[in-house]
Amino acid sequence: MPTINQLVRKGRQSETTKSKSPALQDCPQRRGVCTRVYTTTPKKPNSALRKVAKVRLTNGFEVISYIGGEGHNLQEHSVVLIRGGRVKDLPGVRYHMVRGSLDTQGVKDRKQARSKYGAKRAKAAK
């Protein structure tokens, strides 16, 4: 335990928090190019084929990004926008694709939570 004098001289050093999405480098989103689009399986209690893409960002980072929603149009060389946000049951996936921007289309026939999936409002039937 330090003495008062030692604290006056040095002071306490505050712990710096590590970023959960370092590839964004404090930006809200980053643009990148898909290098590989594939499906992968989640961790133990869950079972599915989750759609993910390996993305080379404009700042040189290469990250794995999750493609949310039902169906997508992405392939190799698609230009995409990624945001932070991990997928709990996919190890190594710390980013999400932004649907409805750049080459990523919005989710078709989406009625609720449309803004999260880049879906336009459906025309009212008359």
Swiss-Prot record:
The segment annotated Disordered runs over 1-28, 103-126
Q: Which UniProt keywords apply?
A: Methylation, Ribonucleoprotein, Ribosomal protein, RNA-binding, rRNA-binding, tRNA-binding
An example GO CC term for this entry is: small ribosomal subunit
Where does the record place Basic residues bias? 113-126
Q: What does this protein's UniProt record list under function?
A: With S4 and S5 plays an important role in translational accuracy. Interacts with and stabilizes bases of the 16S rRNA that are involved in tRNA selection in the A site and with the mRNA backbone. Located at the interface of the 30S and 50S subunits, it traverses the body of the 30S subunit contacting proteins on the other side and probably holding the rRNA structure together. The combined cluster of proteins S8, S12 and S17 appears to hold together the shoulder and platform of the 30S subunit.
Assembly and oligomerization = Part of the 30S ribosomal subunit. Contacts proteins S8 and S17. May interact with IF1 in the 30S initiation complex.
The protein's name is: Small ribosomal subunit protein uS12
Q: Which gene encodes it?
A: rpsL
